[in-house]
């Protein structure tokens, strides 16, 4: 899916690995993400729509680089039975854990919590502080993450909170 620049992965497939790496390096030297394209998709089981923020392809590549650095550092520090938005964990694993708890410990209580608009209201400062607490101390990287969080949303302006769903470092 194209971002605001109209480019997709097809537009950069012809570049050599060296050209891609050099372009990413140049962009990271003084990183300024392009604006994010707003797209609305249907929410399952509802008439409402979920807003997605679609970054430009080069910004997605940079986010992928960041994800590949952050994930192996942060993931081992997360609770072992946390299943949302984690690699190799899904709803089936969560259900299996619940069934196991019911069978082993006879726990029959379940709480279903859905925090309305959670990702749209994440405090940027608190998120960056949490990333610091998890051991990410590189100030340049934290600055880049901050810029990504504050990427202009086409037609809406610069957000002061929230993580635009649709990027690689967002849910």
Q: What do the PLM-derived regions correspond to, one by one?
A:
Residues 15, 60, 72-73, 121, ...:
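Residues at alpha-helix boundaries and the short loops/turns that link adjacent helices
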Residues 49-78, 161-171:
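Conserved pre-motif C helix in the palm subdomain of viral-like polymerases
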Residues 8-15, 29, 49-61, 82-89:
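Short coil/turn segments at secondary-structure boundaries
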Residues 20-23, 27-28, 32-39, 77-81, ...:
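Conserved polymerase palm-domain catalytic core
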Residues 1-21:
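Non-catalytic, polymerase-adjacent accessory regions of viral genome-replication enzymes
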Residues 5-7, 52, 116, 168:
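Alpha-helical hydrophobic packing sites
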């Amino acid at each position: 899916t194209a971002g605001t620049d109209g480019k997709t992965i097809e537009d950069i497939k012809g570049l050599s690995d060296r050209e891609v790496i050099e372009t990413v390096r140049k962009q990271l030297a003084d990183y300024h993400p392009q604006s994010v394209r707003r797209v609305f998709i249907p929410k399952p089981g509802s008439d409402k729509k979920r807003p997605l923020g679609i970054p430009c392809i080069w910004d997605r590549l940079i986010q992928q680089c960041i994800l590949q650095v952050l994930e192996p550092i942060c993931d081992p520090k997360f609770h072992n039975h946390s299943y949302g938005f984690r690699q190799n964990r899904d709803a089936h694993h969560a259900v299996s854990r619940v069934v196991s708890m019911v069978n082993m410990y006879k726990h029959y209580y379940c709480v279903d919590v859905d925090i309305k608009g959670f990702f749209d209201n994440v405090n940027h400062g608190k998120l960056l502080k949490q990333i610091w607490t998890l051991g990410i101390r590189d100030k340049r990287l934290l600055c880049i993450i901050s810029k990504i969080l504050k990427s202009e949303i086409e037609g809406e302006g610069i957000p002061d909170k929230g993580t635009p769903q649709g990027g690689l470092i967002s849910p």
